[in-house]
Curated annotation (Swiss-Prot):
GO terms for molecular function: ATP binding; tetraacyldisaccharide 4'-kinase activity. This is Tetraacyldisaccharide 4'-kinase. Keywords: ATP-binding, Kinase, Lipid A biosynthesis, Lipid biosynthesis, Lipid metabolism, Nucleotide-binding, Transferase. It catalyses: a lipid A disaccharide + ATP = a lipid IVA + ADP + H(+). The gene is lpxK. ATP binds at T65, V66, G67, G68, S69, G70, K71, T72. It comes from the Bacteria.
Length: 341
């Protein structure tokens, strides 16, 4: 199914005419999606539906396409950057695939099955205060009250207009970009490509164009998936790689570029919930390599010879200064408003 969707949304020159036919059959549904989503955004823009402003700056990290683009590494990068500048950031997120009544604090010991894979990964890596819930405003208020954060990052929050934002970061896959440039379901877009012109920063995971900031995901080391394992990874000839992320081919390419010889790859659905049986049916007893996001879902049952590849985001040199200039402006305005009150 995932391969079919990818070929529909990200067509190649040699794709058969059948894919083009399906695309046009889905276009009326895309038009309906555009009407509903555009009306919703317009209501917030006109003030008919009120967006809630918070007393601290809000940085939104998101995209206008479905699937992986590098949002989670970007969030981790921002956490470390803001901390280095003396700020106390917190993160809010939906918690994909998790049913929550109200809001939930993401504790380091909680697994991906109870908080979602991205929140589990972010907190495991950074120990940042993080709250998840469908109502991001309530989640943000919880962060401020419980953890005294002075700046909030909204993970995958570009389309959540109920919470007012001060800085918008659009994350874009440099290889896929906007695909066939059609809205869901005929294409991968959540919003039209013109939305890019309204954000403060566009960060491209890969080759950037003029006015965009390039991000490189730099592999750092292979880490055992199991917290009980101390086995060091050594490249061997029978490694199997698996990935349950939005763009698994990017991960497999990264492994190849790192000099790892992989005899077999298996792409699962994004946000795949794994089991030991499911993975070993693919890998047998072979050494396994996976992404960090997948690893947080496999820790409880991982074998000793399973590792994940940790990556760090590296952004264009001028990005940090440009972002912090914007953040300081927002802080000054919000502090001024509090002084007036």
């Amino acid at each position: 199914m995932q391969d079919f969707v990818n070929r529909l949304w990200y067509p190649k020159a040699d794709d058969c005419i059948g894919y083009r036919g399906i695309k046009w059959l889905l276009t009326p549904l895309s038009l309906l999606f555009w009407c509903v989503s555009s009306l919703r955004r317009l209501l917030f823009k006109l003030g008919i539906k009120a967006a809630v402003s918070l007393p601290v700056p809000v940085i939104v990290v998101g995209n206008i396409t479905v699937g992986g683009s590098g949002k989670t590494p970007t969030v981790i990068y921002l956490i470390e950057l803001l901390r280095a500048q003396g700020l106390n950031p917190g993160v809010v997120s939906r918690g994909y695939g998790v049913k929550i009544d109200g809001v939930k604090i993401v504790e380091p010991h909680l697994g991906a099955d109870s908080v979602g894979d991205e929140p589990a990964m972010i907190v495991a890596r950074t120990q940042v205060p993080m709250v998840i819930g469908s109502d991001r405003v309530s989640a943000a208020k919880c962060l401020i009250e419980r953890f005294d954060v002075d700046i909030i990052i909204s993970d995958d929050g570009l389309q959540h207009y109920k919470m007012a934002r001060d800085v918008e970061l659009l994350i874009l896959d440099g290889e896929r970009r906007f695909g066939n440039e059609l809205l869901l379901p005929a294409g991968p877009l959540r919003e039209l490509t013109g939305r890019q012109k309204t954000v403060d920063f566009t960060i491209v995971n890969g080759e950037a164009k003029e006015g965009e900031f390039q991000m490189i995901l730099e592999p750092t080391r292979f880490i055992p998936v199991s917290p009980r394992s101390e086995l060091v990874f050594e490249p061997v000839e029978h490694v199997v790689a698996i990935a349950g992320i939005g763009n698994p081919e990017r991960f497999f390419t990264t492994l190849a570029q790192s000099g790892v010889e992989v005899i077999k790859t298996k792409a699962f659905e994004d946000h795949q919930k794994f089991s030991l049986t499911q993975i070993t049916q693919v890998t047998g007893n072979s050494p396994v390599l996976m992404t960090e996001k997948d690893a947080v879902k496999c820790r409880d049952f991982a074998k000793e010879n399973w590792w994940y590849l940790a990556v760090d985001a590296k952004l264009a040199e001028n990005f940090d200064q440009r972002l912090m200039d914007k953040v300081r402006q927002v802080i000054a305005v919000k502090q001024g408003n509090r002084d007036v009150v």
